[in-house]
């Protein structure tokens, strides 16, 4: 079996990594940056260290802080217009998945005709575009180091998943010092998103030894440190360990692929503007229980990684404990336990079925699902 492991050219980790990145980029003389972020992050002062470092190096930049959760193609076009108007030369994304995905989509437009959603699917982006630095503030989507971007086509009310090595940032930055003030609910949702990445990658039909090692260690770290990061956001060790865990999960799914959890989660996220991590967290135990018969031995190893003492258990029993451990962690960090708590009704489901099955994440799922089975999974998640 052959496989590909694509990563950023440079990854910087740890407190102070933002300053290290700026010094590195200064030497490259890329020109003027468009900083793509969310206005709330600016108001919270999270970008102050970035601004100070850029100013110290006398590096030119323009701020685009209009990003919102679940970015749309219209937002991407707005960002690209800002890039052109300011005559920028490269991109710096600052935030979680939404700012980084927006910057990736803008990157597409710097070297390819629009819209960015035209490149939905795998390997359709012909030209790489300008350099991209991705500074991650959540743990998280791992968008700072993956080949994925998710942009909403508002007319069709669908999340378009763009997967291409040309979207991998040139420099990935995980600086835990800018993660300390992320609210508990966001910490919980993004952490469960990272757990979903790791588990889906581990049971994916595309899994291989390199992704297995990364996925299992990611599961172990997230299970251990996510509750601590939720309980005390200023626990720097917990934030750093979660940053490591989500990065390892990104390494795993960037090569092995994802599965039905993401395929199904993208639909309510698009139609109801729900947080991606929450959608994943609600669906994760339900869909992995559906997948379990096709990957019993693998789920037994997931249980071990989540701290379950499986000595004396059969793989079947241990695999069931993996599902229980997922549910326990989800409840522990305060994730809603059903979509009905978020304004979703049974009537919404029918419009999601075909889109979920057509999602690029679906083919790597270890157990194929029919349209009727997808409906039942959604109903169980209400």
Predicted regions and their residues:
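C-terminal and late-domain segments of enzyme folds
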Residues: 184-248, 252
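Short, amphipathic C-terminal "tail helix"
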Residues: 345-382
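A glycine/threonine-rich phosphate-anchoring loop and its flanking beta-alpha core
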Residues: 111-207, 298-305
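Glycine-rich phosphate/pyrophosphate-binding beta-alpha loops
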Residues: 140, 247-280, 359-363
